């Protein structure tokens, strides 16, 4: 069975952080997650509102003190739709409600699709003005799906859908708090082959438990902070750095036209301050005694020299850092030892890195003392990744993308003179030839690529590596301000995603639901902390239920589910619920049309689960197409590195991972997506069986859709 679902995206956030679509495919649109995202208002749920209860509610309602017969009022509440109280004697052959034993129940019949249903609401004499139900003990005439619609004080409706068994089910409410009325509805049922449903269903309520008291406090977490004069936690991402090598020598390099007295005092760096980018000076500022730089090349890691000996003479270079000022990068490593000397060797390779750490204070003079104080930023050391190998049956990778070709016309023009209004005429000194290139037409062609991974080929996936974070002290305000270097500031080496002022086109229900349950979960910094909440199965299920509870229409629900799946897509290998958890919701909503968003890459992911029941094995394959979304690092949070990815050429199987650390490469500020780039595949570890996940490449297209396909086969053991 296949259900076509629409996909559109939206939101907004804090500190102008950006999220980028399409990092799987190397492109896409950047959106601004500003205060509208991080500061989104939470929905009222039983865990975050003050729930006043009457003494009767404190103990729960089991109807033992209710007279049999028609029920219209009880404990100040109004009962509508045809409730009646009856004794449950457990007649022979009657299994309805037997899970809850004998006793009294209240029952009523509902017509399919009747929005009024059976209702329970606050009356004038209830003594309270709102309520939060913790759970219902319910049973139905036959196994069926029920809906519970809560009428909220602001006029909105909070919805919950739950399956109910004939023998009895306990239905827990986690979404709707502070309601005025609840309506129990028998909705249109999900059609299964060979099963038909009656147009009317008898529903019985055995007990109601109420959520009473103050809001549930957010679980506390302990944060280890080292003693310091000033502590500041900054967000960092494991990134590649550049490496500096400085070696001592026995000779002093002297410039031809500039010499200084041998008695001059060595001038060392007086002050360095931490910053967020390394700024090499483009022009040399000669000092009394400086070590020249002969060559600048990029390396892998930035570390200061272990031993540096100042010399007596000064030379300048086109690329060197002034001896009076060093602007460090995000992470710093102080010089280990500095000793005086009479001869200076030029640095053989010196390059500013993305992350450098100078010494905070160095005592100038003929003898230079080791650094007394260093202030590195937060340093993250990723642990060795763990690997899980899985042998899977043949897997088909389907990659859909667009190819774009543009036709240009080129012409050459000669400028011999200009009008009087042109003050700087290029033809003033003679004929000037210019070339003009104009795009004529652009053609976009859809391309679909299909390839199959051979059966039995082992594929290894690098699971998310955990990071150790150390917070070190920052300099106090009394630290002297260093002299700024002269020269023009060059472009930083760091590659960052572009900042955008465009708000993501997703329904507001997404950030509101995230904030609602992030507030009830420990450790997560905010609703952008995807690495914290996406691997949590219960959290993901709560978000899907919240989207259904508060989505204003079926189209909005569909769009919001797809957007949330895009946020958590990279974590599907470790949490398949991201792909499969919304299946029930997508089966009961009706989507009209197909909303589009241009230039949004997306990936098709297939999750296969194997279920063994009695003497048969059932494999269910769920296919979901999701947008590629990378959330920015949350404010004040420590980013967790997402699962590593593998990139393979088209038509080939993903290469096995040996477990060794690959050579570092320059990365973006945002962590890379965990779903494969190109046409690679990701195979997750086994949670409860074989759950392979494959992913096609991201593509840039004119439309965006989500397809859930459930295919099953049964093989007798």
From Swiss-Prot:
Glycosylation (residues): 614
Compositional bias (Pro residues): 652-674
CC terms in the record's Gene Ontology section: extracellular region; plasma membrane; side of membrane
Free-text description of this protein's post-translational modifications in UniProt: The GPI-anchor is attached to the protein in the endoplasmic reticulum and serves to target the protein to the cell surface. There, the glucosamine-inositol phospholipid moiety is cleaved off and the GPI-modified mannoprotein is covalently attached via its lipidless GPI glycan remnant to the 1,6-beta-glucan of the outer cell wall layer.
Phenotype on disruption: Blocks the adhesion of conidia to locust cuticle or fly wings. Significantly reduces the virulence. Delays spore germination and results in large multicellular hyphal bodies via interfering with the organization of the cytoskeleton.
UniProt similarity note: Belongs to the RBT5 family.
Name of the featured protein: Adhesion cell surface protein MAD1
Gene assigned in the entry: MAD1
């Amino acid at each position: 069975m296949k259900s076509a679902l629409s996909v559109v995206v939206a939101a907004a956030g804090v500190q102008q952080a950006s999220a980028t679509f399409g990092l799987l495919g190397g492109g896409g649109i950047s959106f601004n997650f500003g205060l509208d995202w991080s500061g989104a208002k939470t929905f009222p749920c039983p865990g975050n509102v003050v729930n006043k209860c009457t003494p009767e509610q404190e103990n729960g309602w089991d109807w033992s003190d209710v007279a049999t017969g028609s029920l219209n009022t009880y404990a100040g509440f109004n009962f509508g739709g045809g409730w009646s109280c009856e004794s449950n004697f457990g007649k022979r052959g009657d299994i309805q409600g037997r899970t809850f034993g004998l006793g009294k129940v209240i029952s009523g019949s509902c017509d399919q699709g009747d929005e009024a249903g059976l209702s329970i609401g606050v009356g004038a004499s209830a003594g309270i003005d709102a309520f939060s139900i913790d759970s219902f003990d319910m049973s139905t005439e036959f196994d069926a799906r029920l809906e519970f619609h809560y009428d909220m004080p602001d006029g909105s409706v909070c919805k919950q859908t739950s399956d109910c068994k004939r023998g009895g089910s306990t239905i827990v409410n986690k979404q709707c708090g502070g309601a005025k009325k609840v309506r129990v509805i028998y909705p249109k049922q999900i059609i299964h082959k060979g099963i038909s449903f009656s147009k009317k269903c008898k529903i019985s309520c055995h007990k109601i438990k109420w959520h009473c008291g103050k809001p549930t406090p957010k679980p506390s977490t302990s944060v280890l902070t080292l003693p310091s004069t000033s502590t500041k936690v900054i967000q960092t991402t494991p990134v590649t750095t550049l490496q500096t090598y400085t070696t001592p020598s026995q000779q002093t390099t002297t410039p031809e036209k500039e010499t200084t007295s041998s008695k001059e005092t060595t001038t060392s760096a007086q002050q360095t301050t931490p910053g967020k980018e390394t700024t090499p000076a483009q022009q040399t500022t000669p000092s009394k005694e400086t070590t020249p730089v002969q060559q600048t090349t990029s390396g892998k890691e930035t570390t200061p020299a272990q031993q540096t000996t100042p010399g007596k003479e000064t030379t300048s270079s086109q690329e060197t850092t002034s001896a009076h000022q060093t602007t460090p990068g995000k992470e710093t490593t102080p010089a280990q030892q500095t000793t005086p000397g009479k001869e200076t060797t030029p640095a053989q390779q010196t390059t500013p890195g993305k992350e450098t750490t100078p010494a905070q204070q160095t005592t100038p003079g003929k003898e230079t003392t080791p650094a007394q104080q260093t202030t590195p930023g937060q340093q993250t050391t990723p642990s060795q990744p763990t690997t899980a190998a899985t042998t899977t049956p043949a897997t088909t990778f389907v990659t859909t993308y667009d190819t774009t070709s543009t036709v240009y016309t080129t012409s050459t023009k000669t400028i011999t003179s200009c009008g009087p209004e042109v003050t700087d005429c290029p033809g003033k000194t003679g004929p000037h030839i210019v070339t003009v290139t104009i795009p004529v037409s652009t053609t976009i062609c859809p391309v679909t690529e299909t390839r199959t991974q051979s059966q039995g080929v082992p594929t290894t996936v690098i699971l998310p590596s955990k990071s150790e974070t150390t917070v070190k002290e920052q300099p106090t305000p009394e630290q002297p301000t260093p002299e700024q270097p002269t020269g023009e500031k060059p472009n930083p080496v760091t590659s960052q995603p572009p900042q955008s002022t465009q708000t993501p086109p997703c329904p507001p229900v997404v950030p509101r639901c995230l904030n609602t349950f992030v507030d009830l979960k420990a450790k997560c910094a905010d609703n952008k902390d995807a690495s914290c909440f996406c691997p949590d199965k219960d959290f993901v299920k709560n978000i899907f239920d919240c989207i259904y509870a508060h989505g204003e229409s079926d189209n909005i629900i569909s769009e919001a589910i797809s957007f949330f799946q895009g946020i958590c897509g990279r974590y599907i290998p470790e949490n398949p619920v991201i792909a499969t958890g919304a299946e029930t919701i997508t089966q009961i909503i009706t989507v009209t049309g197909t909303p589009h968003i241009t230039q949004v890459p997306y990936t098709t992911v297939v999750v296969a689960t194997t279920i063994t029941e009695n003497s048969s094995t059932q494999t269910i394959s769920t296919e979901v197409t999701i947008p590629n979304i990378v959330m920015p690092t949350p404010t004040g949070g420590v980013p967790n590195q997402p699962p590593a990815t593998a990139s393979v050429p088209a038509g080939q199987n993903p290469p096995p991972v040996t477990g060794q650390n690959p050579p570092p490469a320059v990365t973006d500020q945002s962590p890379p997506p965990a779903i494969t780039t190109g046409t690679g595949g990701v195979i997750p570890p086994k949670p409860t069986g074989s759950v392979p996940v494959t992913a096609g490449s991201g593509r840039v297209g004119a439309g965006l859709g989500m397809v859930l396909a459930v295919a099953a086969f049964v093989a007798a053991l």
